């Protein structure tokens, strides 16, 4: 049985494995990485901008002049947040040099594990595209931001990328009987790393604590959305009653009669009359 990769303990255990990280980055970005350091919960001191960010996994490869960030999306994150993360890493490079020459390429890879009704895509790549006046592209900035969503994998998904999307999806949806491409040695290794029985007692405890906390936050967000919908419906009902009141006012109907017909207060009807 697999442990779910939408849990940060399991997620970090998998993607901090050097072999897994190298294969995954190669399959998604095409880049070779040989990290000198692999950090978790990476932050920058002092913080860049007004937000003190934490990056799930941060790998630095000075040989290939490459930095790779990997982030798991929690329920409350959105695309703009990770654009900020991506730019923060670039800005950190600038802060660490005397001049503005960056010297390294930054790739940020974001895992979205929930369904996205707006962008139903398996892989979205965002890059800084520079175009000259004649229409020619100029490769000024190599940095890229990748969004992966296993819910929208298909036959058109590149096979190597699909293997990783299926691993994440199956660990969440079918952990007891996952359907994976175990013909690939690296996928077999990845599967072994996230076997539920292979978690240490400490990893298991932290994973359960985190899941409980995130479930609590998700319930709070759901409650907030429901309250927002109720407020929206109530506001819509009131606006409809106001429209009726305006029409009756235009016909010269008395305030008391309008109040009885719409349920609006006489004071509000008086404001509508003045407005």
Task: Walk through the language-model features, giving the residues of each.
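Accessory alpha/beta interaction modules
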Residues: 1-144, 154
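Short, charged alpha-helical interaction segments and adjacent helix-coil junctions
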Residues: 1-5, 9, 62, 66-71, ...
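Generic structural signal for hydrophobic core residues of well-folded globular domains
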Residues: 14, 28, 112, 151, ...
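Active-site cofactor/cluster-binding pocket
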Residues: 134, 151, 230
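C-terminal segments that line or cap access tunnels to active or ligand-binding sites in enzymes
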Residues: 143-156, 167-171
């Amino acid at each position: 049985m697999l442990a779910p990769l939408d849990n940060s303990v399991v997620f970090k255990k998998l993607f901090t494995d050097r072999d897994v990280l190298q294969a995954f980055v190669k399959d998604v970005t095409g880049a070779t990485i040989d990290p000198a350091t692999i950090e978790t919960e990476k932050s920058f001191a002092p913080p860049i901008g007004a937000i003190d960010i934490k990056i799930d996994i941060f790998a630095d490869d000075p040989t290939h002049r490459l930095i790779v960030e990997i982030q798991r999306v929690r329920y409350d994150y959105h695309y703009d947040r990770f654009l900020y993360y991506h730019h923060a890493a670039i800005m950190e490079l600038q802060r660490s040099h005397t001049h503005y020459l960056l010297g390294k390429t930054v790739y940020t890879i974001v895992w979205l594990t929930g369904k996205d009704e707006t962008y139903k895509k398996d892989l979205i790549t965002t890059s800084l595209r520079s175009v000259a006046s004649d229409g020619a592209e100029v490769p000024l900035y190599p940095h890229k931001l990748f969004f992966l969503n296993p819910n929208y994998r298909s036959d058109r998904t590149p096979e190597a990328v699909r293997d990783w999307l299926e691993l994440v999806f199956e660990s969440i949806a079918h952990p007891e009987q996952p359907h994976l491409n175990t013909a690939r040695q690296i996928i077999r290794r990845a599967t072994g790393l996230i076997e539920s029985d292979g978690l240490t007692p400490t990893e298991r405890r932290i994973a359960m604590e985190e899941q409980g906390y995130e479930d609590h936050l998700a319930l709070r967000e759901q409650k907030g959305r429901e309250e927002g919908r109720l407020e929206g419906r109530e506001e819509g009902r009131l606006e409809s009653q106001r429209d009726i009141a305006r029409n009756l006012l235009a016909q010269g109907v008395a305030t008391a009669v309008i109040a009885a017909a719409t349920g609006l207060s006489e004071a509000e009807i008086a404001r509508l009359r003045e407005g």
